Amino acid sequence: MPKRILEGVVVSDKGDKTVVVKVERTFLHPVLKKTVRRSKKYHAHDEANTYKVGEVARIIECAPKSKLKTWEVLPKGGAAQA
């Protein structure tokens, strides 16, 4: 199965080699037929501490690195594709 790639905004860079990325998704409510926005925060591994709060980051699934981190940030510029 291919690894998922998500895009979101960095909301925290306080941890060493860790960023928290908020990913927002939209869907149509089945009863109200209205577009609903939902967001989820993912802890992602940032080896070089390159991302800062407010920047848009792309994250990819990986093997678990810690209790909360199962995602890695892709390098800036989009050079690396999985």
UniProtKB/Swiss-Prot annotation:
GO biological process, one term: translation
InterPro entries per record: NA-bd_OB-fold (IPR012340), Ribosomal_uS17 (IPR000266), Ribosomal_uS17_bact/chlr (IPR019984)
GO MF term list: rRNA binding; structural constituent of ribosome
Gene Ontology terms: cellular component: cytosolic small ribosomal subunit
Keyword list, A-Z: Ribonucleoprotein, Ribosomal protein, RNA-binding, rRNA-binding
Membership in a protein family: Belongs to the universal ribosomal protein uS17 family.
Function summary: One of the primary rRNA binding proteins, it binds specifically to the 5'-end of 16S ribosomal RNA.
Subunit structure: Part of the 30S ribosomal subunit.
Name assigned to this protein: Small ribosomal subunit protein uS17
Encoding gene per record: rpsQ
